[in-house]
Structure formats: C-alpha cells, structure tokens
Curated annotation (Swiss-Prot):
UniProt cross-references to InterPro entries, sorted A to Z: LipoPS_assembly_LptD (IPR020889), LptD (IPR050218), LptD_C (IPR007543), OstA-like_N (IPR005653)
Name by which UniProt lists this protein: LPS-assembly protein LptD
Source species of the chain: Photorhabdus laumondii subsp. laumondii (strain DSM 15139 / CIP 105565 / TT01)
An annotated GO cellular component: transporter complex
Similarity annotation: Belongs to the LptD family.
Keyword tags: Cell outer membrane, Membrane, Signal
Assembly and oligomerization: Component of the lipopolysaccharide transport and assembly complex. Interacts with LptE and LptA.
Cell compartment(s), UniProt: Cell outer membrane
Source species, domain of life: Bacteria
GO BP terms, alphabetized: Gram-negative-bacterium-type cell outer membrane assembly; lipopolysaccharide transport
Function: Together with LptE, is involved in the assembly of lipopolysaccharide (LPS) at the surface of the outer membrane.
Length: 774
C-alpha cells in the first residue's frame, strides 16, 4: 500500500520528483542551469579509497600538520574538494584526531550535492563537516539554497542548516523559497524538518509555521497537500486544504476542510487500509447545517427533510483470505437525493440515479463456488412508487465439471429475497436452477460449441392489494429449455499493401432457441434490456437478471476482420453482424420493441476501430433494429493525440427515442432521445502556456449540455491554472438549470521530470470527462 502526496509549500515540489511524464521542451530548459555529475561512479567503501592531493605549494610538520597552498584539489572516490588553502592537523593523542580546514573559494561536490563557501572544516575521523556562509545546489535535479552554516553529520546522513533556505527555482530566480532558523535534512528517512519556517514569494514572507516537516523522497509523509480554490454561482467561493496523515505503513488518511461560502464548512475524510483481510477505503463527508439547503427547501427546490445536515458515507473493500474466502463491500449512502447534485464527489454522480449498497461473502474451491450477498439501492428519484428492489439476501452457487468425456457440465443456482424500495409494490422470494451441458470442439483455426440448458424458476410473490396488475400470481413456476450452437473460424494472411502486416478474417455463426413462456404473471424485480452491440448479438439473453427470459428462434451471423502490424499491434478492426428472427422474441405483452408479429425481423450491429497512425485514431459503433425501423444507438470518436498535452477529439453519441421509451421508462430526462456532439481539445500555446476546452451540444434540445475551458501557465518551479465550467445541474419547468463555476489552482513545482502542463487533469475535472479513443 503506497500513497505519496505533494504537501503544501515546498512539499508540493518535493513529491513531484516522482512524476512519470514530462513536457520535453520545458524540461530541457529547466535542466540547463542544473549541474550534472558526469564522472564514472565509484562504488564500494569510499572512505577506504586513497586520497589524491594537488596544490601549487605544500608544507609539512610531520606528523602534526600539513599545509597545501594555491589551487588545492583533493579527491577521494566520488568526492572532490577545492580551495585556495587547505591545512591538515593531527593530534598526538593515543587515538589521533585528524581535521582539515579549507579557506578561500571552498568548493565541494559529490554525485548528490555541490557546496560553496569561504571556509570549511571537517573531522576526518567521523566525517563531520562544517561549511560557513555556504551555497548548495542539488546535482541532477532542481533544488538549491543557502545557509549561514551547513553541518554534515552521521556519515553524511544528516545535513543541518543554520538559517537555511530552499527553493526549486533555477539560479537567478527566487519566485518562492522556504526559510528556517534550523533545517535538518535526513537522507535515510527522506525527510526535512524546518523550525520557524517562513514561506516567501518574491522574497516577501506570506506564511509562517513554527515547525514544518517535508518529504524529500518517495517515503510517505504527513503534511498539507495542494490547496484548491474555486467560485460558482450556486456555491459561491470554495477553498479546500487537504491534510495527509501517514498513520502507519498500512494505514493512511486524508482530512480536507472544505469551505463553501454559501453553505458552510464541510469536512471530507478518507481513510485507506491494507490488512490480512484485504484492502479498502472508508470515506465520510459532513456538512453541518447547510445554509443554502435551508433556503432551497423553503423554495421547494430541494426535498423537505427535518435535518439540514448533509453527509456521505462510502466503504469499498476487497479481500481474499486463505485463498478460498472472498469479501467485497461496495456501499454508498448520502443524506438526501440531491447530495450529488449539490456536491462534486469521486464516490458517485447524480447521473447514476442511485447509490449502490452491496455486501458479499464468497467461498471458492476447484470445481465450485458460492456467494452470499445483499444488494440495496438508494434511489435519488422523488417518486416513492418507483419500482426498485433490494436483494436481501441473495445466494449464488456455481458448479463446474469439465472433461466428462467430450462434455463440460455447469450448474448455476440462485435463491433471492426481493423487497421494494418504493411503496405498494410486489415483493418475492425467487429460486432458480440452471444446469447446462456443453460439447466444445476446436482445432487451430476453428471452434464449435453446442449447449443444452434448462432454466427452472419458482416465485413466491407477495402482492399488495393496491397493485394495479391483476395478472400477478402469488406462486409461479417457469421452466424453459434452451439450445445454442455456435461456431467460429479464424483465417489469416499477409496484407496486399504491406507484407509485414497480417489480416485476419473471423466469421461467426450462432443458432439460439428458447420456447415462449408468458411471464406477465411475474413482476419484474431485476431484469433490464441489455445493449445490443456487436458482441451483444451473440448473447443468449435479451435481458439481464432472471425475471424476463425472452423466447428466441434466431440465427446470428457476424464477420470480423483485423489488421496487425509487424509488432502484432492491432491497427484496424471491423465487425458487422445481424440477428435474423424466425419468430419474434417476446416475454408476454407486446411492447414497442417487439410489436411486429412477423418473421424476418433483423437487428444489425457494427463496431470499428482504426489506429491510423501513432497520433490518429477512430472508433465507432452502430445498432439498427428493423422492429423499430430506426438506428437505435450509435457513437463515433475521432481523435488526434500527439502527446499528453496535445490532443483534439470529436465525438458523437445517439440513442433513439423509441428505444429509450421501450427500455428505460424510468429515465424521464432522456425520453426524447439522446443526440450529443462533443469537441474536446488540449494544446500548448507555448512552452509555458496551455489551453484546454470541452464543448458538448445536445442537438435534440438544441442547447449546450456542458462547456469547459481552462488556461494554465507553467514554469520550472511553479504553475497556475484558471478554469471555467458551465453545466446543467437540474431541470425546472422543463427548462435546464445551469451552474457557472470558476476554479483557481496554484502549484509549486521543480524537483522532478514532470513539467507537463497538466492538461489531462483539467479535462478529467468536467462533468463529461475526457476518455481516450486509443
């Protein structure tokens, strides 16, 4: 478990040592003034190596002293000392004390640091060294400063600075620095302790702390993280100051005071742990007496609640014990349905429509496994009659037995108890058993699988008197057989245009048969229509869950072609497939999606991906359903990306209105369909200036859905960015409600190879975050 944070002030720069990406031009510019140790590194016990001394003149009073005068150069291993004059003294004690005093233009360097000063003293017995009125410069990385006196102790483990300073800015640039009456650098523990610390900008003190501990390496250290400030119409001024607490090697926490001028002080807390039982994250956010929420309730724009406190609790855990036990928790609960509308959070989004609360305990052996779970949902909809169900509990069993002669056996079983989130909805206990036998056949270029399955389900339903559907029955048995046969072949050849490229041709065919069974007497507890992309054409189910098992008498055919380069990197693929229905699939009453009572209906789906070169990429997909007579869904992305800071992406997504009304009636905001075009761009204006932007337009509503623009200025030792975002946060009287938000960030930089403009981070902050196309 490892988490390294940049801390406030100098810490924001120290941790940047370990960034992975660099803006090449600025990185090269920042390294121009940095010394590099270009001599061969000598390993071993350096103190046992011989000492070589060169000087214009020398005098000796053996064995008590020796003096070297003029252009003195002393070298031992990787260490070099030069000065105008050097004197070596040795006492005549039983254990002689040997010291060296250097004066005049003293210069010391090794692979880690360079020291300069008018005078230096060193104890050759224990290697203690003092440098007076010294300047120091780190080697191979940014970092320099001064000290009235610099002391090296503990075989150079400790560097103690009296009235010391530190900055990551290049020589001649003092944009910022940290000053302390005493600074102790511990190279082994990788930490710097500063007493009476003053943070200065352009030599003007702006922050004081009696004690400050800063990381100077990759070890985790407690401290303040980079602050964040923003302003929005709905929330006013916001300021976040995170504090990272390194509790133990396997525990840490982040505590973030979050001031919101229109709401109050919110505390965001995250705790991470790693134990024998697994790894996990706990989060608790709390805002006492939300002032804006009180006002919103008075205007009926927020749900009426007795409490005005806003909070979030989150727990995610994943663990394995003794190689057979598995523990998983995914639990999110908020104070009210509008929480994610009012607060941005990494733990959920208002577009999800609900918060998941799931606990599961699993046990696995070689041929079987079992999982006991509970699943609940906190629904954000204000409709209390909405049909959403909890599974409390649910038991899933799987048994596998391969190589039964030529056959493979699988048995799946489930028992679940469903309770309703809303009022006056049916509830049930469901038992399901699903044995299947497979006959797989394959060789080097083809495969075939034949499967016979039996799906037996029993329902014991509790039906309230207020239920509108009179067809529901308390006890229902449903038994359905299924037969599926699928075959696939793979052919390959060298391409005509380039013999180093390989093209594959992959035809695929599947026949699926499930007889019809009227299921209108069963309430729908957990089934929803699955998306039919190309891979979805070859599923054996139209619905997820078990409450709706559609009839099927259909043949699915598909063809995929791929092109690989000489390094076996996939450069292009195209898949096109269709389902031909001999009988219309149905589960009971007709709906828009299966309203036509005729054979010959088809569903088409295609996906493509084209990596044109290392900078250009294209991908997309489309589904067409003859039952609706329309394109049901489509998406396309064209992207140019030269590096992390230079990219332009054009994207489009479409979902047909009839398809949504047939499959997602509980999403009123999208009942008119989805048709959105987006443009995302990031580009450096110069080595130091960068611009990012994102614009999404809803062609159905004929209005912008989201807009984002950000400007960043980056130097070798600090960076600043300003962002503006306009997004839809709700609906009122069928009109969109927008929020305008300004954000401001200041970051110290310098001791790293990371001179990136941070464009990716800015694009990820939007309500529709950037996603790579390739």
């Amino acid at each position: 478990m490892k988490k390294c944070y940049p801390t406030l002030l100098a810490t924001t720069v120290w941790a940047a040592l370990y960034g992975q990406y660099a803006h090449a031009d600025l990185a090269a510019q920042c390294m121009l003034g940095i010394p590099v140790y270009d001599q061969p590194i000598i390993n071993g016990d350096l103190n046992q190596l011989p000492i070589n001394i060169l000087a214009d003149d020398s005098r000796a009073d053996y064995p008590r002293s020796a003096k070297f005068i003029g252009n003195v150069n002393i070298k031992q291993g990787n260490k070099t000392l030069t000065a105008d004059q050097v004197q070596l003294d040795q006492t005549e004690d039983k254990v002689p004390l040997r010291t060296v005093t250097a004066t005049g233009n003293v210069h010391y360097d090794d692979p880690l640091i360079i020291l300069k000063g008018p005078r230096a003293w060193s104890n050759l017995n224990n290697k203690d060294t003092d440098m007076y009125q010294s300047d120091y410069q780190m080697v191979g990385r940014q970092g320099r400063g001064t000290a009235d006196k610099m002391k090296l102790r503990g075989e150079n483990r400790y560097a103690i600075l009296d009235n010391g300073t530190f900055t990551s800015c290049l020589p001649g640039n003092d944009s910022w620095s940290v000053v302390g009456s005493e600074v102790i650098l511990d190279r082994e523990e990788e930490v710097a302790e500063i007493w009476n610390a003053r943070f200065r900008v352009a030599n003007v003190p702006i922050f004081y702390s009696p004690y400050l501990q800063l990381p100077i390496g990759n070890k985790r250290r407690s401290g303040f993280l980079i602050p964040n400030a923003s302003y929005s119409k709905n929330d006013g001024f916001e300021f976040l100051l995170p504090y990272y607490w390194n509790i133990a090697p396997n525990y840490d926490a982040t505590i973030t005071p979050h001031y919101i001028s229109k709401r109050g002080l919110k505390l965001d807390n995250e705790f991470r742990y790693l134990t024998k039982a697994g790894t996990g994250t706990l989060a608790l956010d709390w805002l006492n007496n939300d002032e804006q929420y009180v006002k919103d309730k008075k205007t009926n724009t927020r749900t009426a609640r007795e409490s005005d406190n806003r909070w979030l609790f989150y727990w995610r855990h994943s663990g394995v014990m003794d190689r057979v036990w598995r523990f998983n928790i995914d639990y999110t609960k908020v104070s009210d349905p509008e929480y994610f509308s009012d607060f941005s959070s990494q733990y959920g989004s208002t577009t999800d429509g609900y918060a998941t609360q799931k606990f599961s305990l699993g046990y696995a052996q070689q041929n079987w496994n079992a999982t006991l779970s509970t699943k609940q949902f906190q629904i954000f909809s204000k409709d209390t009659s909405r049909k959403a169900y909890r599974a409390e509990p649910q038991l899933d069993l799987n048994y596998y037995k391969n190589d039964l002669g030529p056959f493979d056996l699988k048995v799946y079983g489930q028992a679940a108890k469903f309770t309703s989130v809303g009022k006056n909805n049916p509830e049930a206990t469901r038992w399901h058993l699903e044995p299947s036998i497979n006959l797989p056949l394959s060789n080097g270029w083809a495969s075939m699988n034949n499967e016979v399955k039996l799906m037996a389900t029993h329902y014991q339903q509790d039906i309230p008197k207020a239920t509108e559907n009179a067809e529901y029955k308390e006890s229902v048995n449903r038994v359905l057989p299924q037969f599926k046969s699928e075959a696939k072949m793979v052919f390959e050849r060298s391409t005509y245009l380039n013999n180093n490229y390989t093209q594959t041709l992959e035809p695929q065919v599947q026949y699926l048969y499930v007889p019809y069974k009227d299921q209108d007497n069963i309430n729908n507890f957990d089934s929803s229509l699955l998306q039919t992309d190309y891979n979805g054409l070859f599923r054996d189910r139209f619905y997820g869950g078990l409450d709706r098992i559609s009839s099927a008498n259909q043949v699915t055919t598909g063809l995929t072609t791929r092109i690989y380069d000489e390094s076996l990197v996939e450069r292009f693929n195209l898949s096109l497939g269709q389902i031909y229905y001999f009988e219309r699939p149905r589960t009971g009453k007709e709906t828009i999606i299966n309203s036509k009572d005729s054979t010959g209906m088809m569903t088409w789906a295609g996906d493509t991906y084209w990596k044109i070169n290392d900078s250009w990429g294209l991908k997309g997909g489309m589904q067409y359903d003859t039952r609706l007579g329309n394109v049901t869904m489509g998406n396309a992305v064209l992207e140019y990306r030269r590096d992390e800071d230079r990219l332009v992406q054009l994207n489009y997504r479409f979902v047909d209105r009839d398809y949504i009304q047939a499959t997602a009636k509980s999403a009123p905001a999208f009942q008119q369909g989805i048709s959105q075009v987006g443009l995302v761009a990031s580009w450096p204006l110069s080595e130091r200036w960068g611009l990012v932007g994102a614009y999404y337009y809803d062609t159905k509503e004929q209005q912008p859905a989201s807009q984002l623009v950000g400007l960043q200025y980056n130097t070798c030792c600090w960076a600043i960015n300003v962002g503006y975002e306009r997004k839809i946060v709700g609906w009122k009287d069928n009109n969109s409600e927008y929020d305008n938000k300004w954000s401001f960030n200041f970051e110290l930089r310098g001791l790293s190879n990371n001179h990136s403009l941070g464009s990716r981070k800015m694009l990820q902050s939007g309500i529709m975050p950037y996603q790579r196309a390739f």
